[in-house]
């Protein structure tokens, strides 16, 4: 677990576009177009994070909040600096 990092994410499903919005305290805010049913929104968040961080989807693991808007993802530690340096249009 030393080579992993937990990222808190606040998700807005059924949005107009898939987008990383910015930070709300310690949590990264994201919007996804998929509805929160049958894991569709979770899969969309995983895809969005993987693309933004240039990671394979298998490196983005949902560890808490499967049915909640507040989620926790396990990511490789090497992306921590990338998360905080993302250019986010608010």
Curated annotation (Swiss-Prot):
Please provide, in alphabetical order, the Gene Ontology terms of the cellular component aspect for this entry: cytoplasm
| Pfam families per UniProt | DUF167
Domain of life, per the record? Answer: Bacteria
Q: Which HAMAP family match?
A: UPF0235
PANTHER family for this protein = UPF0235 PROTEIN C15ORF40
Record's family? Belongs to the UPF0235 family.
Protein name per the record: UPF0235 protein CPn_0497/CP_0257/CPj0497/CpB0517
Q: What is the lineage of its organism?
A: Bacteria, Pseudomonadati, Chlamydiota, Chlamydiia, Chlamydiales
């Amino acid at each position: 677990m030393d080579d992993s990092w937990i990222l808190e994410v606040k998700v807005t499903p059924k949005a107009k576009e898939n987008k990383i919005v910015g930070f709300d305290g310690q949590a990264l805010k994201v919007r996804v177009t998929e509805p929160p049913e049958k894991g569709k929104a979770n899969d969309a968040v995983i895809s969005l994070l993987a693309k933004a961080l240039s990671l394979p989807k298998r490196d983005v693991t949902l560890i808490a909040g499967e049915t909640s808007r507040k989620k926790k993802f396990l990511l490789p530690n090497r992306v921590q600096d990338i998360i905080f340096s993302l250019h986010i249009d608010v």
